[in-house]
Curated annotation (Swiss-Prot):
The gene is ispD. It comes from Serratia proteamaculans (strain 568). GO terms for biological process: isopentenyl diphosphate biosynthetic process, methylerythritol 4-phosphate pathway. This is 2-C-methyl-D-erythritol 4-phosphate cytidylyltransferase. The lineage of its organism: Bacteria, Pseudomonadati, Pseudomonadota, Gammaproteobacteria, Enterobacterales. GO terms for molecular function: 2-C-methyl-D-erythritol 4-phosphate cytidylyltransferase activity. Catalyzes the formation of 4-diphosphocytidyl-2-C-methyl-D-erythritol from CTP and 2-C-methyl-D-erythritol 4-phosphate (MEP).
């Protein structure tokens, strides 16, 4: 892997970390659960800061968050903090406001600690040739079922060809993401990730194949799986 290859300009990273993660059934927001000697959030931040093209990570935390500033990573001069909102889009937008004159911004889930350096490098290398950006994604491998509306019964099988699991990081031109995110919010569109905001405005971001072990810790059983994957990364 060659971090010096290419001419991609510096990238500012934004991590929306204002959520509470109720599905984890934990006593604290999921991003503050510990794997090894670090929180999930710290693992996610370190995965980005290891790349030389990412000089700064902006973390959007909840207004009542008392935990982030207690973490060692909070003292890193490359890490900035802002207050996020109730929705992911609000937190991302708050982070974008601090990105200054950066041309490109990368958004990564705070609860996605298992990012491989090779995936990040591939995303940067491929997306630098795009005018609209792109996302890490993994092709769907399982059989997909559509449920009947409001019921736990199968309606039909969904053809999995051309279906992808959206992952993060997601990388876009800063000005374009701000424009599309604001328009989607103003229109009341559902914004589940940053790519969906660009889709709302008629753009077609790139799909960059990434590893399926880049999981988002969402449920209690994900914690042990993430710990295993991180062990493999360390080795």
């Amino acid at each position: 892997m060659n971090h010096s290859a290419g001419t991609f300009p510096p990238v500012i990273a934004v991590l929306p970390a204002a959520g509470i993660g109720s599905r984890m059934q934990a006593d604290c927001p999921k991003q503050y659960l510990t794997i090894g000697h670090q929180t999930i959030l710290e693992h996610a931040i370190h995965a980005l800061l290891r790349h030389p093209r990412i000089p700064q990570v902006i973390v959007a935390i909840g207004p009542d968050d008392q935990q982030f500033h207690q973490l060692p990573i909070a003292k890193d001069p490359r890490v900035r903090v802002t207050v996020g909102g109730q929705q992911r889009a609000d937190s991302v937008m708050a982070g974008l406001q601090l990105a200054g004159e950066a041309k490109w911004v990368l958004v990564h889930d705070a609860a996605r600690p298992c990012l491989h350096a090779e995936d990040l490098e591939r995303l940067l290398a491929i997306t630098e040739h795009s005018e609209v950006g792109g996302i890490l994604a993994a092709p769907v491998r399982d059989t997909m079922k559509r449920a009947e509306p409001g019921r736990s019964t199968i309606s039909h099988t969904v053809e999995r060809q051309d279906l992808w699991h959206a992952l993060t990081p997601q990388l876009f031109p800063l000005a374009l993401l701000k424009l599309c995110l604001q328009r989607a919010m103003d229109d009341g569109a559902t914004v589940t990730d940053e790519a969906s905001a660009l889709e709302h405005c008629g753009y077609h971001p790139l799909l960059v194949s990434g590893r399926s072990d880049n999981i988002k810790v969402t449920r209690p059983e994900d914690l042990a799986l993430a710990a295993f994957y991180l062990t493999q990364l360390d080795n």
